[in-house]
Amino acid sequence: MRCTRAIRQTARTGWLTWLAILAVTAPVTSPAWADDPPATVYRYDSRPPEDVFQNGFTAWGNNDNVLEHLTGRSCQVGSSNSAFVSTSSSRRYTEVYLEHRMQEAVEAERAGRGTGHFIGYIYEVRADNNFYGAASSYFEYVDTYGDNAGRILAGALATYQSEYLAHRRIPPENIRRVTRVYHNGITGETTTTEYPNARYVSQQTRANPNPYTSRRSVASIVGTLVRMAPVTGACMARQAESPEAMAAWSERAGEAMVLVYYESIAYSF
């Protein structure tokens, strides 16, 4: 597995070499796509449309620090007080993440720890002015507070990140439809069904072209985990997984990813 070997080799030769390469090659300004915010974003969730179409999505709490959200500190495995709901402008990434969760169910059944059945949902959401680009918001944070360690990887993050942060809530009226994916652990068959949301309100809107300006973190942010591919942050991804596990997931999905790991705060809890 190329990604896994690369990670292990990086650990042996020193991650500072990788950081030096990124510091030289990362763009010094935000990329052109940052000026063209998406009209549609996607979210993986385990909750059924009977709940989501009625209630929408609500953030954990009121912590609007972008860096703490992206590193997972304010998410479920941390303090569970993030003021953001994670979405992705990449449907493919969301599908890859769902496939990963489905594979987990299959492997658990093989190990005698489950039935192998799996149900997951991909929600298609109309973005509006309440959605902010994670990359541009990260740039804004670094520029405002002068986090030099973060600045080294800011260009790489801005280039490859596809997360959009909904502040506080995504109302049902913004949720266009859902794709339900069911894997039968007995037959091995996977079926996909799409359901429209009767409460959806069609409008011509896009995500906010401006970054979200957040307060400064009171925590000691010593590092982050950057995945060099379209990804979402730790609040949707599984930051508790090791880099090796995430590399294996990437290769199973057929997407070559380069993982750069430097003292991730996600592993400090």
Swiss-Prot record:
Alphabetized UniProt keyword annotations: Signal
Keyword Plastid: no
A matching Pfam family: Pertussis_S1
Single Gene Ontology MF annotation: NAD+ poly-ADP-ribosyltransferase activity
Matches recorded under InterPro entries: Borpert_toxA
An annotated GO cellular component: extracellular region
UniProt xrefs under SUPFAM superfamilies: ADP-ribosylation (SSF56399)
Signal peptide: 1-34
Family, as annotated: Belongs to the bacterial exotoxin subunit A family.
Protein name stated in the entry: Pertussis toxin subunit 1 homolog
Organism phylogeny: Bacteria, Pseudomonadati, Pseudomonadota, Betaproteobacteria, Burkholderiales
